[in-house]
Structure formats: structure tokens, C-alpha cells
Design a protein with these regions (language model features):
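Amphipathic alpha-helical segments that form well-ordered structural scaffolds
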Residues: 16-25
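Conserved catalytic cores of phosphodiester-cleaving nucleases, focusing on short active-site segments
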Residues: 22, 50-52, 69-75
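Active-site beta-strand-loop-beta-strand hairpin of nuclease catalytic cores
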Residues: 53-70
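Interdomain/boundary linker segments immediately adjacent to catalytic/signaling cores
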Residues: 1-16
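Active-site glycine-rich loop that binds ribose-phosphate moieties when present
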Residues: 32-37, 47-58
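Acidic, metal/cofactor-coordinating or nucleic-acid-engaging core segments within structured domains
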Residues: 79-146
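A short acidic/basic microdomain associated with nuclease active sites
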Residues: 24-43
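Charged, structured surface patches that assemble and position nucleic-acid processing machinery
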Residues: 119-187
Length: 187
């Protein structure tokens, strides 16, 4: 069959990386259904890149401290530029408009698995208030990070919302890692 192109491999691996960061480091639940609904192998699914959520109460009864996370992920694994951070911050603003559609898509996928209650609580914010956190995640193959990072923002591009986090994941030869992971998965 047709292999995934480098851009799609890069995007997929970085979305998985940010999903893992949210799930295993920050203890969020992260539905992993986005990659299963492509219109083509080299087409990215539209909507919020990564959705994650966390319940305040162990029994998952609604609490206004429950949290829904929308992460915008940008990557340039073949170079060492900081530009993915800037692009993620700018495009993260779009998640305010795409989030409801993306959560509804997750609900449909969870319904197929008999787990509809898992994310249903986050569909109707007016009924049960919760917090929304927007994450702008940039990933590149930079080995070391400078003490000061200048991103050349202008005007309202610079605005970082009160409920926004910025992640920058970097490491040497990340594109090589993405290709290696892809090859191992194909075997």
C-alpha cells in the first residue's frame, strides 16, 4: 500500500507525543480516535488536534473544576526552528470554534464502544460548567533551547489567554525517530 508522507508522519507522531504527555505526565484522559477517520492516508483529520479531559471527582460526577483540554500541535521535525511554537499559538485560537465539533466526534466514537458517558459531560457547558484549557504545542528537532526565544509576533498574535499553556518539545533527530517508529509499526 501507499506509505504515509513525511509531513503526515511528523504530524501523527507529534500528536501522539503530545497525547502521551497529557495522559502519562499530566494525568488526563485522552481519546485516541482522530487518526482512524481520515479521508485519505495523507490527509489530516480536521478539528482540534488533541482533546484531553480530567474529572475532579473520582466517580466522574460533574464539578466546575472538571477540565477539558484542546491542544493545537505544530511540528517541523526536519529542522531546528522555533516557528512551530508561534504557529501553534496562532492556530490555537481556532480551537475555540472547532472544539465542540471535535468533542462531539469523540462522543460518537465512544458511543460505538459503549463508553458514551466518558465525554458526554463536556458537550453542554451551560448545564454543567467546567474549565477549558488551550494548549499550544510546538515540536522541533532543536537539541538545545536558547535562554530567550524570540518568535516575532505582532499585535493580537502575541496575546496569550489566561487559560492557555505553551508546550515546546524538542530533541535531536526527531524526524529520524518518526521514520523509525513508522517503519517498526509497518512490520
Amino acid at each position: 500500500g501507499e506509505e504515509l508522507g513525511a509531513t503526515v508522519r511528523s504530524a501523527d507522531i507529534t500528536e501522539i507525543l503530545i497525547s502521551d504527555l497529557l495522559e502519562f505526565v499530566h494525568q488526563y484522559s485522552v481519546p485516541r480516535y482522530k487518526l482512524k477517520n481520515r479521508s485519505g492516508k495523507n490527509n489530516s483529520q480536521q478539528g482540534t488536534d488533541v482533546i484531553a479531559y480530567k474529572y475532579k471527582n473520582e466517580d466522574k460526577t460533574p464539578n466546575d473544576k472538571d477540565e477539558l483540554v484542546a491542544a493545537e500541535v505544530k511540528a517541523t521535525l526536519s529542522n531546528t526552528e522555533y516557528i512551530p511554537i508561534k504557529n501553534a499559538i496562532i492556530d490555537s485560537r481556532k480551537d475555540e470554534h472547532r472544539l465542540a465539533r471535535s468533542v462531539n466526534y469523540c462522543r460518537k466514537r465512544l458511543k460505538e464502544l459503549g463508553k458514551i458517558e466518558e465525554v458526554k459531560r463536556f458537550l453542554f457547558k451551560p448545564d454543567n460548567n467546567y474549565r477549558i484549557t488551550y494548549v499550544a504545542a510546538g515540536v522541533s528537532s532543536r537539541e538545545n533551547v536558547d535562554d530567550a526565544i524570540e518568535l516575532d509576533f505582532s499585535g493580537e498574535e502575541l496575546e496569550i489567554r489566561k487559560n492557555e499553556l505553551i508546550f515546546y518539545v524538542h530533541g535531536k533527530k526527531l524526524m529520524e525517530l518518526a521514520h523509525n517508529i513508522y517503519q517498526r509499526c509497518c512490520k
